[in-house]
Amino acid sequence: MAYSFTEKKRIRKDFGKSQSILAVPYLLATQMDSYREFLQESVPPAARKETGLEAVFRSVFPMESYSGNAMLDYVSYRLEKPVFDVVECRQRGLTYCAGLRVRLRLAVMEKDDTTGAKRVKDVKEQDVYMGELPLMTEHGSFVINGTERVIVSQLHRSPGVFFDHDRGKTHSSGKLLFNARIIPYRGSWLDFEFDPKDHVYARIDRRRKLPATTLLRALGYSTQDILEMFFDMETFRLIDGDLRYVLIPQRLQGEVAAFDIVSPETGDVLVQAGKRITVRQTKALSEVQGLHEIPVPDSFLLGKVVARDIVHPETGEVVVQANEPVSGELLDALRKMPSLTLHTLYLNELDRGPYISETLRIDTSRDAHDAQMEIYRLMRPGEPPTKDAAQNLFQGLFFSPDRYDLSAVGRMKFNRRVGRDEITGPGVLNDADIIAVLKVLVALRNGVGEIDDIDHLGNRRVRSVGELMENQFRLGLVRVERAVKDRLALAESEGLTPQDLINAKPIAAVVNEFFGSSQLSQFMDQTNPLSEVTHKRRVSALGPGGLTRERAGFEVRDVHPTHYGRICPIETPEGPNIGLINSLSCYARTNSYGFLETPYRRVVDRRTTDEVEYLSAIEEGNYMIAQANSTVDEHGVLTDELVSCRFKNEFTLANPDQVQFMDISPRQIVSVAASMIPFLEHDDANRALMGSNMQRQAVPTVRSDAPMVGTGMERVVAIDSGAAVVARRGGVVDIVDGARIVIRVSDEETLPEEPGVDIYNLVKYARSNQNTTLNQRPVVKVGDVVSRGDVLADGPSTEMGELALGQNILVAFMPWNGYNFEDSILISERVVAEDRYTTIHIEEFSVFARDTKLGPEEITRDIPNVAEGALRHLDESGIVVIGAELAPGDILVGKVTPKGETQLTPEEKLLRAIFGEKASDVKDNSMRMPAGMYGTVIDVQVFTRDGIEKDARAKSIEEHELARIRKDLNDQYRIVEEDSYQRIERQLIGKVAEGGPNGLAAGNKVTKAYLKDLPRAKWFEIRLRTEESNESLEQIRAQLEEQRQRLDAVLEEKRRKLTQGDDLSPGVLKMVKVHVAIKRHLQPGDKMAGRHGNKGVVSKIVPVEDMPYLADGTAVDIVLNPLGVPSRMNVGQILETHLGWAAKGLGKKIGAMLDSEVAMAEMRAFLAEIYNRSGKKEDLDSLTDQEIRELSANLRGGVPMATPVFDGASEEEIGDMLELAGLPRSGQVTLYDGRSGDAFDRPVTVGYLYMLKLHHLVDDKMHARSTGPYSLVTQQPLGGKAQFGGQRFGEMEVWALEAYGAAYTLQEMLTVKSDDVSGRSKMYESIVKGDFRMDAGMPESFNVLLKELRSLGIDIELEQSK
């Protein structure tokens, strides 16, 4: 196999047994593809599919005036180039977006007076601006107002029809009440339901119910039509007063015979009256000849329901209406008529209930008009119904494409559920649809068919960014449509253009609201690269049109068999959102309908093939699917007698011959975060859940350290997240410094019109959304040859192109003086000294100078009443200098605000006369460092409003930025120029010249020496013999010139952006942003965790010499409590510890071999022993000796291992690795007490564990208040760190003081230390004077209580006791 540039530097030993035939797909594909489909930016207008934006425009346009004489139609749209790029938008607090220009055609018609036909009078076509559309960055996020946001995908109930029952909870008898619900993509919901009396009702939009037959009548069906649709008929004939029954023997099966059934041929009694008719008798009856009609007694007909109106043949009068039961009188009346055929409903107790017939009896409406009026009263209570209004409302509910849309998905689901073969159809409902649903519902009540499982992933679909945005855009456009229709009337008379008709504000408002405040638009979790990826792959059941936390029951949150390979069963938040917010599995993707699907490899005749097929949850149920770790031989044939499979959502064992598909990979069922946990299969699910969630909270450390025991997913996440910089094209590294990498692209990857240079500007100490540091470091050197896709630079939490969330730490599982009681963690001082867990956090402080009523605020160094020492960090503009080390209270930006004129005392007037005006009319309003925060200034940005002169600091920042851009462009031009001249040189040397500068005579050959002496600019003056060569030279010259002009234009554009004024919010004249870097060392109180849900808080940092140590003197770094393992059942951490120790031991062995300079052959043999003993085989022979030497050097710190989830290293393999490293196979060793030097009395498990430092840092949580702000009403100190609040001395604490009888302490607590306003200020004075007496006054909260009582009308007065 071919290794990439960084992979060959440090190969990860892979224990995986199952061969992977499909690489993990691009992790952000769901987001990227969805938005790309929505915008179709790069697709020419004529070729665009009708999805996304295009679909919205096509569905809303054309807009017609009410008279029909003017029409506005859509032609196409285009997106303009964004004004600012992503980085600039982040800095300036802008939205990264592009203007949307829509080409519209306005046609004005006129009527021909003679024919009445319309003809086009005037057509205008114009590009209309329709607001701005946010663009997605190349990593799947959006920049909105300068912050990165993610639009989370929503998992909602798919449109279609669903059948369910109430699980017997509604009625006390426990009877199952069935219901059906037709859910459209947009429009009114239609429900049908049974009540306890078995009547069928309909509800529209969950309003009051009405009989379902009312809806059928409104569709124009009569009672007879309805009965014929839902029931089979029984036929009776009255011939000369005799009643005969048309016999269908199958219908008698299971019934009790009401009379003797006699054979007409023999006269034998075939079935005796009162006996139940068996299957055998039914069969015998069907074989008897002449038994088509049998005479029956009148009692057999009585009570049956008439199915069709009976009309008197002579008078034409309706004698009996359909749906009437047959009574004795009715039968007598019918007998008076000549011969008659009577149809009744075929009903029975078991599977032919009279539900629709019974419902018709309670239905008060008689015809379509009545029914529509009834529906109108239900939908618009209080409004007087008219025939037209009722008809229009009913038509608009389910049958109008403007108001109702099932969508392609809904139609497909609907047709499949009601048993139709065709899966396409109209987006609106029709009569047949409603009848089909009722038929299925009645069949369910009759015991035929099954209800739907709403938690099945075939009934829930994913709405991603593109679709959510499409819905919002449609909302905006519909609002615009209303206004346009009103204005179109004017277009006819006043000759308006499309631009005049359209106001884009409603669209902009809807889009901004969606991105700014929708529940699904979330502030991106940027703690580390994994948290970014996970956030973009999240699927939420909450949000508009989804569930709410309070209403969601247990079933919705639970893991469903269809989640397999689609949604991770492990990763979900703890707390109220559990199960409602999920993560996509590694290989999952959405299909064209929005259903999640997962890949499987096809199995044919026991043999696994490389053919991959994606199946959705609906399709998957029909196949027998084997697990990924089923044993196969070298030919890919399943060898086991029985294979563990899934079939129809159940787990089963099957014969290999029945297997049709097989999982792609064992990690298929889990999400990205869960697949990063080694030995996941040995952890309890609850702890694995914590492990996956806590990895997302790991803070990037100053020195990244990739895990020695990983899972092989580390590289995928680092690259797909965008944290690591990846080469766009292959080539040679030309320049590398800390902030950028310049690559000279290889010729075969350069197109003629493209520059042959790629410049990668690295992100340096930028602030993430969570205030962690985003910093990239190059991993290549000048001269390195890189290919496309190779890692050029590491980002935050990545090392050598692999994700590195924490540190490999030497851990011992043992108690240590109680300092690791209850999950506490004991740490060695060495961990802190080596900066293993030191993190840098960047805080951003923004200062605004506003225009106030009293005059403009000013950012200045001239601040009243501030000592010169306090200004030591400020430059002449009053802004802190970069590199200043600040402490709490230090001034970051000096700002003065004008204050109103006050009446001055004579002394102040004298002082003002002496010292000038300035001192009194402004007050200090400077931005200072908050309490408890120490840090270094690393960046300052100054934004000035257009028309206001920039200060010196703003100008110097501008010049610095311009110089950086110029340097980039110069390098780009230099490489392109260098490349061009090399091509010219190759073309000129050895060619015969026609003439040239410096006396080059015609007929002479051009030599290298001649070119060396000739200035390069004059090379183009050389004329060659062949015209073709001259043209080629001219082409290179033109390309070079064009490139220079293009780069000049880019520089000019950048200069214009930098020098123009900034667009600040109203009233703001100047904005200064200061970034302060804060270094946080590991300290007691910080939260740490492993990857197995083993979390704890640092309790003590112990000197190295006191820590337990191994026999060779190595002190352990961290001591964990062994009691944290058995009850938590996360044994994965123990296996990781053992394998980590083996990895480290092998690294030490390799280091020793390098130091003793063994032969390369010996080194290769040892590496082969490590890499190829078990698991995946590595192709070490493809590496050169130099590469093997570099690989070995990188393995000194430990051989990185990968144990993929559900396919990892076995206990046996871990033991082998420990032995190979020369360590005890048990993984345990005798430790010695650092303080006494004595050996502990039993061996201790020791090894390397990957530990993370989480974002719950004690510095962010702890604070101490001296004096600070008070609540306005109660005058008690505020609470919480953000308000610089105090510790609440609450009710229970007061009880404690009362119990101890500490009266004076209690009085202090309730008065001067809390809300006795005058008392606390006196207290301050008395402390200053050294007088420690105390007079307690009235607490303010008592006054509040009095006011509260008085407001209730109870007068309370306080009287001084005499």
Curated annotation (Swiss-Prot):
Keywords: DNA-directed RNA polymerase, Nucleotidyltransferase, Transcription, Transferase. The RNAP catalytic core consists of 2 alpha, 1 beta, 1 beta' and 1 omega subunit. When a sigma factor is associated with the core the holoenzyme is formed, which can initiate transcription. It comes from Acidithiobacillus ferrooxidans (strain ATCC 23270 / DSM 14882 / CIP 104768 / NCIMB 8455). The keyword Nucleotidyltransferase applies. One of its GO terms (cellular component) is DNA-directed RNA polymerase complex. It catalyses: RNA(n) + a ribonucleoside 5'-triphosphate = RNA(n+1) + diphosphate. DNA-dependent RNA polymerase catalyzes the transcription of DNA into RNA using the four ribonucleoside triphosphates as substrates. Its EC number is 2.7.7.6. This is DNA-directed RNA polymerase subunit beta. PROSITE patterns: RNA_POL_BETA. The gene is rpoB. It holds the Pfam family RNA_pol_Rpb2_6. One of its GO terms (biological process) is DNA-templated transcription.
